[in-house]
């Protein structure tokens, strides 16, 4: 079958032919319709330090997708041929304390689709049926293809009560923008997103944020004054992984504020811990999606009117995958969707 693979330990992704994956007793086989390019895929393309330590070569990559069930393992129940599905990209062990306690997103033995085992940039993907999620009929293939990153946004945003709260989102990548949109949709008062990338700040404006702030040109304190905020932000969502951005977020938080951190710093990060201690801040780390509460909430949010379509800015047939990666690497894109139809 046709697949996009990391074939060499150097920059790039290559189209190749690989054997069709084998179906296990507890697996389903998915014929891929659409895939989306994740920032992780860009790291793998660039062959950065993390990728060199993590990704086996050769490897079929990709983990954002939607497709149709075409084969079902003999032990599988609850799925039928023809079901439209996406799937949780974190495959868990089922026997560690967190898995047995129902906290599977915290499994200490997680294996990543398209990271540690063959991924979805291929005509067919096999995953455990446990990981598959049926897509409701009124959700499009394009939106279903970005459920993985949307889930990161939903998990982060819904970590805390948002109704009537003032929220600062640090980092206007696609996940940060979607998180900001979720905050507005569920009833936050002011949702401010901060970045230095004007293209992505414009995308955030299209998604309905209260203010999109280019922090290279504007001061967050001035924005807070403009919005009539007499105290700091109640909720902070750190989506950038940039140490200066996190320090700025800490400076802007109200006493007793709550922070959810999804962005991954490139190395050890120093902060002024006095901000955390004397403000009584609560900081929660976010990894992936809650299985499968986040998935049900994603579907419900879209069905209740949350419009994510502006975040999908580029669409290419799979044979033009290089243009998709070029768009992602340029920093002037939202989500990029590749069609396998």
Curated annotation (Swiss-Prot):
Zn(2+) 2 binds at residues 93, 96, 99, 107. It is found in: Cytoplasm. One of its GO terms (biological process) is L-threonine catabolic process to glycine. Its EC number is 1.1.1.103. It comes from the Bacteria. It catalyses: L-threonine + NAD(+) = (2S)-2-amino-3-oxobutanoate + NADH + H(+). GO terms for cellular component: cytoplasm. The record marks 148 as: Important for catalytic activity for the proton relay mechanism but does not participate directly in the coordination of zinc atom. NAD(+) binds at residues 175, 195, 200, 262-264, 286-287. Coiled coil: none annotated. The active site is at 40 (charge relay system), 43 (charge relay system). SUPFAM superfamilies: GroES-like (SSF50129), NAD(P)-binding Rossmann-fold domains (SSF51735). Binds 2 Zn(2+) ions per subunit. It is an enzyme of class 1 (oxidoreductase). InterPro entries: ADH-like_C (IPR013149), ADH-like_N (IPR013154), ADH_Zn_CS (IPR002328), GroES-like_sf (IPR011032), L-Threonine_3-DHase (IPR004627), NAD(P)-bd_dom_sf (IPR036291), PKS_ER (IPR020843), Zn_alcohol_dh (IPR050129). Gene3D superfamilies: Medium-chain alcohol dehydrogenases, catalytic domain (3.90.180.10), NAD(P)-binding Rossmann-like Domain (3.40.50.720). SMART domains: PKS_ER (SM00829). Transmembrane segments: none annotated. Keywords: Cytoplasm, Metal-binding, NAD, Oxidoreductase, Zinc. Zn(2+) 1 binds at residues 38, 63-64. Homotetramer. Belongs to the zinc-containing alcohol dehydrogenase family. HAMAP family: Thr_dehydrog. PANTHER family: L-THREONINE 3-DEHYDROGENASE. Catalyzes the NAD(+)-dependent oxidation of L-threonine to 2-amino-3-ketobutyrate. This is L-threonine 3-dehydrogenase. It comes from Yersinia pestis.
């Amino acid at each position: 079958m046709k697949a996009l693979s990391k074939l060499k330990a150097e920059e790039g992704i290559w189209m190749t032919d690989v054997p069709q994956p084998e179906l296990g007793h507890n697996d389903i086989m998915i014929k891929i319709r659409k895939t989306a390019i994740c920032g992780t895929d860009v790291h793998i393309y660039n062959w950065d330090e993390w990728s060199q330590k993590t990704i086996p070569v050769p490897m079929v990559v990709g983990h954002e997708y939607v497709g149709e069930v075409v084969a079902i393992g003999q032990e599988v129940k609850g799925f039928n041929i023809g079901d439209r599905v996406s799937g949780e990209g974190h495959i868990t062990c089922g026997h560690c304390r967190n898995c047995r306690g129902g906290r599977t997103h915290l499994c200490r033995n997680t294996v990543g689709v398209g990271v540690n085992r063959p991924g979805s940039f291929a005509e067919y993907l096999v995953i455990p049926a446990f990981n598959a999620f049926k897509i409701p009929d009124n959700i499009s293939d394009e939106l279903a293809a970005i459920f993985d990153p949307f889930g990161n946004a939903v998990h982060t945003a819904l970590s805390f009560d948002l109704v009537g709260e003032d929220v600062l989102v640090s980092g206007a990548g696609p996940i940060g923008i979607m998180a900001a949109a979720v905050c507005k949709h569920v009833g936050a008062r002011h949702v401010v997103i901060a970045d230095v990338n004007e293209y992505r700040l414009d995308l955030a404006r299209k998604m309905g944020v209260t203010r999109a702030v280019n922090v290279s040109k504007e001061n967050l304190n001035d924005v807070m004054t403009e919005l009539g905020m007499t105290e700091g932000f109640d909720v902070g969502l750190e989506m950038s992984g940039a140490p200066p951005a996190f320090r700025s977020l800490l400076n802007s938080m109200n006493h007793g504020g709550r922070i959810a951190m999804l962005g991954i710093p490139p190395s050890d990060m120093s902060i002024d811990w006095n901000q955390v201690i004397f403000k009584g801040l609560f900081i929660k780390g976010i990894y992936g999606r809650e299985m499968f509460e986040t998935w049900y909430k994603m579907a419900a949010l879209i069905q209740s009117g949350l419009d994510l379509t502006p975040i999908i800015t580029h669409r290419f047939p799979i044979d033009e995958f290089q243009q998709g990666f070029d768009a992602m690497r340029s920093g002037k894109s939202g989500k990029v969707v590749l069609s396998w139809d």
